[in-house]
Design a protein with these regions (language model features):
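Outer-membrane beta-barrel domain signature, especially the mid-to-C-terminal portions
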Residues: 1-23, 45-66, 84-113, 127-148
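Face-selective signature of the C-terminal outer-membrane beta-barrel domain
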Residues: 1, 23-43
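Gram-negative (and chloroplast) outer-membrane scaffold detector with strong preference
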Residues: 64-82
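Repeated loop/turn-to-beta-strand initiation elements of outer-membrane beta-barrel proteins
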Residues: 36-42, 75-80, 116-122
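Residue-level signature of outer-membrane beta-barrel architecture
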Residues: 30-34, 46, 71, 112, ...
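Short C-terminal domain-edge/linker segments immediately following a structured domain
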Residues: 72-77, 111-112, 142, 150-153
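Non-catalytic surface loops within mature trypsin-like serine protease
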Residues: 75, 85-87, 116, 126, ...
Length: 153
């Protein structure tokens, strides 16, 4: 077990605090919507985490990239797909710096607008079935999904 014993419980990472954190998030994006119904986008970003009391902003990504595409057709249908990468994350485990695996998330979805106020949707998540930690020691679900309705009031 990679945990840190604290009495009868085990934590998977150290809990630390930072009295002042400065966060600068620089992003650049390109969007394409020239074809009717088709929207494509790519966003890349860098996060600067200014910390003084810790070596790093633990478990926070320095780099992120996201690709998204949606297509609307027959007035009521929409399908889409996305890819998101979060990179350069570090965790503090038992006093040691541990480089965390990058997150690569692939999702697809579809929705149908049944009424002006009612939409039915389904979404498949983590289709690459990546076993990465959202937080150190907290593994994400494998392939999973969600289905539901959205109602506007």
């Amino acid at each position: 077990e990679n945990g840190i014993a604290t009495g009868k419980y085990t934590n998977t990472f150290d809990v630390v605090t930072e009295s002042t954190t400065h966060h600068v998030d620089v992003n650049a994006g390109l969007y394409f919507d020239y074809v009717k119904g088709l929207d494509l986008g790519v966003i890349a970003g860098y996060n600067y985490w200014g910390v003084k009391e810790n070596a790093y902003a633990w478990q926070k990504p320095s780099w992120k990239v996201e690709f998204t595409g949606t297509y609307k057709f027959l007035e009521k249908w929409e399908v889409g797909a996305s890819y998101k990468m979060l990179a350069d994350r570090k965790a503090l485990v038992a006093g040691e710096v541990v480089k965390m695996n990058d997150i690569h998330d692939v999702d697809v979805w579809a929705s149908y607008k049944a009424l002006d106020w009612l939409t039915v949707f389904i979404k498949g998540k983590n289709l690459a079935n990546q076993k990465s930690d959202t937080y150190y020691g907290y593994r994400n679900f494998g392939i999973n999904g969600i289905a539901g309705v959205t109602m506007l009031f």
